[in-house]
Amino acid sequence: MEAPTLSELEGLRYSELQKLAKTAGLKANLKADKLLKALKVHFYPESKDESPDYDGGSSLTDTDELNSSQEKDEPVSVSFVTHRRGRGRKPLKNYDTPKDEFLTVSVGTGTESLASETDNTQDQNCLESKKKKVSPPTIDNKHRKRSRSEDTSKQNNSETTEKRQKKASDITSVPSAGKIPRYAGRLSKPESKPSTPNFKKLHEAHFKKMESIDKYMERKQKRLDTVSSSIQEMKMLTKKSNLLKLVEKTPVSDIKKPVKSRLSLLSSLPPTTGASPSRTPTNQRRSGRFSAANKSILFDRSGFKPSVLSSSKMNVRFSEATKDNEHKRSLIKTPARKSSSFLAITPESEPRQMLPNVKKTPARKSLSVLAVTPESEPKQMLPSVKKNEPMATPEKAKKTDLNTTIQPSTVILESTCPQNKEIAITPFKFTAQTTETPNTNKKGRFDLQASLSRPLGYQPHKGKLKPWGGSEENKCGSNNNVSVLKNNFKQPHLQTREDRRKQHEQDRKGKRDQTLGTRRGVPVQ
């Protein structure tokens, strides 16, 4: 292997220097300047004799120790620029001089001799750096560097106490670039301890920014008033429009109709004082307070009037309209249930009787009462109930229409006109059930032949009956599952460790039986 010249060694890159050191059998994991020195000593041992500061590894370690001691005393550099070492770039060896300059400035001695020395050293370093680009370093430069490093180490030892007392803010000069700063956090932190804030002042300042409760309540009330007034206006307008639509749809005569009460079946109207036949009808005599204009907007009158007042008289046999269940005989009508305290009496089942000594009265024109003269309509009398008469048969009870509402017509009796002896009675159809004591309502004896002759209300089963208890398939499995679901339908059964252990034991038993059966040639299910 050919030894490269000194100029070639200085011109090589760091990676090439490492490769060269590996081939020469030297340690390659060194810094660039140390690696270059080691290669020079290896290839040119005469340079070792020329350089008195290189004593094997001891001189290198001495310079390293000096450099490390200087770096510890130095303040951290602020610049973060790293220079790229190119092919033509040579490693700098005079990195001690800016440290000397920085130390002399930071100490601040103020002597002219130190300032002149630093100027001279700067000029010499500039000249030396120019010479190094052309030729390798000489022995004189190395002697000077060594003497300078010794002087600076002495000065640093005497001035370390003064530097520690100074603050980091006093450091004005910028150190040499190209090195990553160490312990930058220590220099940036101020030495003063953090004081606790005055929370009272902070709370007072925050409280002054806040709004008072009175102002907030006033603002809230104004907002609520504006919102509620707009909502109220909209409600009133919608109600008014709905009322006007309802009035347009229905005529005035149909706005208010008398409510037909079931209590007026057996009660009569109050006697009227003699009225002329030329009286205005009731729908025209309605007072002004019931008119649509005078009605309150907030009064909600719904147009729905129920026609069915009780559920006992509703027709729930919907199959009569659809005719889809005619093949079944279970839909034969049964008579309505009768109460034991009432007797169902129809006008056809009783003879008519006249009311004695009934005087004629002028009929009042109303919506619920019809005035009939004797010439236009035959007289109809109130039926009387016989005490010993039994209950009406179901066939007669069927004839009464259960879906119609009863028109409450009453007999008007008046004795103000004694000169009229004729009788005027409004038509009356008494379909209500009269009360009677429960003692007279006795149950009849059961007639077996009559019940057998009646058709069945259901479809009987035809064919062979299944055996008793034979319909259940998989009895044990289904019952077991159902019982578990019944007991734990809200809390499902969670698998515990014991359950898993039992299951594992069962699986092992099954596997053992299967292996034994296969070994003996017995098929195991």
Swiss-Prot record:
GO cellular component: cytoplasm; microtubule; mitotic spindle; nucleolus
Skewed-composition ranges (Polar residues): 58-69, 106-127, 270-285, 476-494
Cross-referenced Pfam families: NUSAP
UniProt-annotated stretches for the region Disordered: 46-205, 248-292, 373-397, 451-525
Composition skew (Basic residues), residue ranges: 82-92
Compositionally biased intervals (Basic and acidic residues): 160-169, 495-514
Molecular function in Gene Ontology: DNA binding; microtubule binding
Cellular compartment(s): Cytoplasm; Nucleus; Cytoplasm, Cytoskeleton, Spindle
Annotated keywords: Cell cycle, Cell division, Cytoplasm, Cytoskeleton, DNA-binding, Meiosis, Microtubule, Mitosis, Nucleus
InterPro entries the record matches: NuSAP (IPR026756)
UniProt keyword Acyltransferase present: no
GO biological process: establishment of mitotic spindle localization; meiotic cell cycle; mitotic chromosome condensation; mitotic cytokinesis
Family, per entry: Belongs to the NUSAP family.
Subunit structure: Interacts with DNA. Interacts with microtubules, ipo7, kpna2 and kpnb1. Microtubule stabilization is inhibited by ipo7 and kpna2, while microtubule bundling is inhibited by kpnb1. Active GTP-bound ran causes dissociation of ipo7 and kpnb1.
Protein name in UniProt: Nucleolar and spindle-associated protein 1-A
Organism: Xenopus laevis
Gene from which this protein is expressed: nusap1-a
